[in-house]
Regions:
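Conserved N-terminal segment of class I S-adenosyl-L-methionine
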Residues: 1-124, 128, 141, 157, ...
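Short "lid" loop at the C-terminus of a central beta-strand within the Rossmann-like core
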Residues: 159-164, 180
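A short SAM/SAH-binding and catalytic strip from SAM-dependent methyltransferases
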Residues: 126-136
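Residue-level detector of anion-binding/catalytic polar loops
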Residues: 103, 153, 197
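Short conserved AdoMet
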Residues: 77, 135, 149
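Conserved beta-strand signature within the Rossmann-like core of class I S-adenosyl-L-methionine
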Residues: 151-159
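A short, conserved alpha-helix within the catalytic core of class I
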Residues: 134-144, 158
């Protein structure tokens, strides 16, 4: 029996099917997930990420990230220490932060795998276009809760599930590395489960506050 990767309940039901994969929705937390048999191997997953060409010199990409970064900067105190979780091969958030005198460390499973960074505590953690790639979001969110200081902020950017009709035409689901998809209901469930306060920043950006 398949269990939800976020809440571990077995209330999964078919949500969508295409030529590549099937997609299941949890009746408890609302997450839409791809069964493990469709997940890429680590080598194939990294090969997909190796194609990314995002750099700090790409003004379009900086503008894209600024929809998370600028609201975050407005909410943190001077001297705050942050972590960019899943920064990718060309970290940009930390570069943008440094330009404003903010210290951000880079962590990525494939490109900046520095486990010691996950043993420190932070005033904020950013995950921009990351959480949809994570096979075990329950464990990850609990880990991030443990490294966030009290009143710390978790900033997440990921496109949100609206409904089945929109999902069926959604380009976002076609990326083979995207395996978990979040709706507003899902983020509300996460907030209740971890006692985090949820703030909706944009159509694809949410902030959680550890209280």
């Amino acid at each position: 029996m398949l269990h939800c990767p976020l809440c571990a309940e077995n209330s999964l039901r078919k949500y969508h099917q295409d030529k590549q994969r099937s997609y299941l929705q949890c009746g408890t937390c609302g997450i839409v997930s791809v069964p493990a048999k469709y997940h890429l191997s680590p080598a194939d997953e990294k090969a997909q990420y190796d194609k990314h060409r995002n750099t700090a010199e790409d003004l379009g990409y900086r503008m894209f990230l600024s929809r998370t970064f600028e609201p975050l900067v407005a909410r943190i105190k001077f001297g705050s220490l942050g972590l960019d979780f899943g920064c990718g091969p060309g970290p940009v958030i930390s570069r943008m932060a440094k330009e404003q005198g903010i210290m951000v460390s880079n962590y990525d499973l494939y490109y900046f795998n520095l486990p010691e960074l996950l043993e420190r505590r932070y005033d904020f953690v950013t995950m921009t276009e990351v959480i949809e790639h994570v096979a075990d979001p329950q464990s990850l969110l609990m880990q991030l809760d443990s490294i966030l200081k009290q009143a710390g902020i978790l900033a997440i950017m990921t496109k949100r599930v609206i409904d089945q009709r929109a999902f069926s035409h959604w380009h976002y689901k076609n990326d083979p590395t995207h395996i978990c998809f979040y709706s507003l209901k899902t983020f509300e469930w996460i907030g209740r489960k971890l006692s985090w306060r949820l703030e909706i920043i944009d159509k694809d950006v949410v902030f959680f506050y550890k209280e």
